[in-house]
């Protein structure tokens, strides 16, 4: 899925609150030229649309800044929002090289219906995401785990996950991800 966002360089000496009142969300792009960072603004509608399509530290985003010669891909590194109003406050992007290795977090999704649940057991998920290493062009959105063969009293470990090609697991392979426990009567 191709996701992109249009940004502008942030005007100097303007309060972030004033920008938000104008419908602009302050943002920053890290790592586009070594250690240099650049202050940006994103339209609020564009930012909200972006966040519906992309997830933090998982989706590559084409960041376009017309005032800069740099164009490239970035990960959304951080999203700041008001704790209860849910208003968007700030976005942080981290520039990535298409062929450079990244350490990222990927969610785990169970597929299938476990044999143990058909026998009256309950499935418990202990780990919701795993740390992996891969190149930027090969980031999986989710890692699916087939639980259909698990019976009551059995479990699946992180080491049992089937990683997509080019993706390396960074977590302890002996950590339990799913287990089927007998239901209390």
Swiss-Prot record:
Tell me, how does this one assemble?
Part of the 50S ribosomal subunit; part of the 5S rRNA/L5/L18/L25 subcomplex. Contacts the 5S rRNA. Binds to the 5S rRNA independently of L5 and L18.
Q: Does the keyword Endoplasmic reticulum apply?
A: no
Q: Which NCBIfam families match?
A: bL25_bact_ctc, PRK05618.4-2, PRK05943.1
Mind telling me what this protein is named? Large ribosomal subunit protein bL25
Keywords (alphabetical) are: Ribonucleoprotein, Ribosomal protein, RNA-binding, rRNA-binding
Query: Taxonomic classification, please?
Result: Bacteria, Bacillati, Cyanobacteriota, Cyanophyceae, Oscillatoriophycideae
What InterPro entries does UniProt report for this protein, alphabetically?
Rbsml_bL25/Gln-tRNA_synth_N, Ribosomal_bL25/Gln-tRNA_synth, Ribosomal_bL25_b-dom, Ribosomal_bL25_C, Ribosomal_bL25_long, Ribosomal_L25_dom, Ribosomal_uL5_bac-type
Taxonomically, the superkingdom here is: Bacteria
Which SUPFAM superfamilies does the UniProt record give?
Answer: Ribosomal protein L25-like (SSF50715)
A molecular function (GO) term: 5S rRNA binding
Q: Which family does the similarity line name? A: Belongs to the bacterial ribosomal protein bL25 family. CTC subfamily.
**What are the disulfide bonds?**
none
Q: What does this protein do?
A: This is one of the proteins that binds to the 5S RNA in the ribosome where it forms part of the central protuberance.
Q: Which Pfam families match?
A: Ribosomal_L25p, Ribosomal_TL5_C
Q: Which residues form a coiled coil?
A: none
Can you quote a single GO CC term? cytosolic large ribosomal subunit
Give GO BP annotations, semicolon-separated: translation
Which PANTHER family is this protein grouped with? Answer: RIBOSOMAL PROTEIN L25/GLN-TRNA SYNTHETASE, ANTI-CODON-BINDING DOMAIN-CONTAINING PROTEIN (PTHR33284), RIBOSOMAL PROTEIN L25_GLN-TRNA SYNTHETASE, ANTI-CODON-BINDING DOMAIN-CONTAINING PROTEIN (PTHR33284:SF1)
The reply on keyword Ribosomal protein is yes
């Amino acid at each position: 899925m191709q996701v992109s966002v249009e940004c502008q360089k942030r005007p100097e000496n303007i309060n972030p609150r004033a920008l938000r009142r104008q419908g602009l969300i302050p943002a920053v792009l890290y790592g586009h030229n070594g250690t240099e960072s650049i202050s940006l603004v994103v339209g609020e509608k564009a930012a909200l649309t972006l966040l519906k399509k992309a997830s933090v530290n998982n989706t590559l985003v084409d960041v376009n800044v017309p005032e800069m010669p740099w164009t490239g891909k970035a990960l959304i590194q951080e999203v700041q929002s008001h704790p209860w109003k849910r208003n968007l406050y700030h976005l942080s992007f981290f520039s990535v090289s298409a062929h450079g290795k990244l350490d990222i977090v990927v969610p785990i999704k169970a597929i299938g219906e476990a044999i143990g649940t058909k026998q009256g057991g309950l499935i418990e998920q202990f780990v919701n995401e795993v740390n992996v290493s891969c190149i930027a062009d090969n980031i999986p959105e989710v890692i699916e785990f087939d639980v259909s063969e698990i019976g009551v009293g059995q479990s699946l470990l992180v080491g049992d996950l089937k990683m997509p090609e080019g993706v390396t697991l960074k977590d302890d392979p002996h950590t339990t991800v799913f287990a089927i426990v007998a239901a209390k009567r």
